[in-house]
Amino acid sequence: DVLPGSLSNMPIFWKPNELTWLEGSYLLVQIEERKCAIQNDFKAIVDAWPAFKRICTLDEFSWARMCVCSRNFGIVINGVRTSAMVPYADMLNHFRPRETKWTFDNTRGAFTITALQSIPSGGQIYDSYGQKCNHRFLLNYGFAVEDNYECDGYCPNEVALLVRLAPEDPLTAR
């Protein structure tokens, strides 16, 4: 078993009292949207193949979907872009700037991870999950980066802002 039994660090699996920590944030909307998308996919599969419901519950399906979401690698195999689950490669923690690169080596028929710099013996090997804002890290991977800054000082964190116009505002007509 190389996949986690629980994904309780991911907010779509949080209890209602834990979700109160996110009150007022756009992340709550994204969590609900993700739950709805997973429920709709589950329903579509069950509608097409009713026996699926006897094999897999919505909770199990949600767990599997989030395992894929948090652990798949985009790769190119023989010129075809695809995604792959790569056991143990998904155990690398996130760090920026990037210290490794990964690819599918067609000549070896293997997924490879290459260090981009010297890593001391016994040192942790990191992967970069990309330049993302903390709400994406939390939604998709179950963690946030304390000082989420790039080397150039850029901070990819985003803040969603809802702006409502009064019905009589001329911009409303546009």
Where are these regions (language model features)?
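Long, positively charged leader/targeting segments at protein N-termini
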Residues: 1-174
